[in-house]
Amino acid sequence: VAVIGAGAAGLAAAKALAAQRIPFVLLEASHRIGGRAHTEYPPDGAPFDLGCHWMHSASINPFVPIADEYSVRYEKRDDYGPEARYFRGGEWVSELALESLAEESETAEVAIAAAWSEGIDSSVAEVTERDGEWTSVLDYYTTLDTSVDPDEVSIGDVVSYEDTDENWPVVDGYGQLVERWGSGVSVSLNTAVRAIHWGDTGVRLETTQ
């Protein structure tokens, strides 16, 4: 079995295959494992996450017990901290004006749920307003949550996401957590997959190695 990418999903797949004693190769284009989970350490030594940082839906997030197992510190919090403020057209956006953002967000959620209930598997961009007052802001949050643009996110992924409103930051760094957890997995680093050929005779991968 070939697993492409040594992010959290790829590492989990490799661990599952190893547990079943199924031969596999794990191919990673980068020089490290972890994908978007990447922690760096500035001169002051404090961990700084360049990618993901929060364990969302903490009570059902499998990385919470993993963090406990590897003694990686995290903080149990009730919220994200100070609320975001928006600056537009040279001035701060008022709370009253932000009501339209909440309304547009709710409209998008309803449109996504309605399309999915009809058996339509489209991208977020295809079923939501593209010229709304807050489209760019909502697109920003979609990308922030999924790491891809709205035209690449399936509405099925959005609907299936279970949000418990428990969001805990990883104090020692999410990248460090994933790195520790995946350190025992055999992986071929600096091995980018350039092409996948899938036919009657099987699957063939072209890599840089």
What are these regions (language model features)?
Residues V1-Q209:
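FAD-dinucleotide binding site
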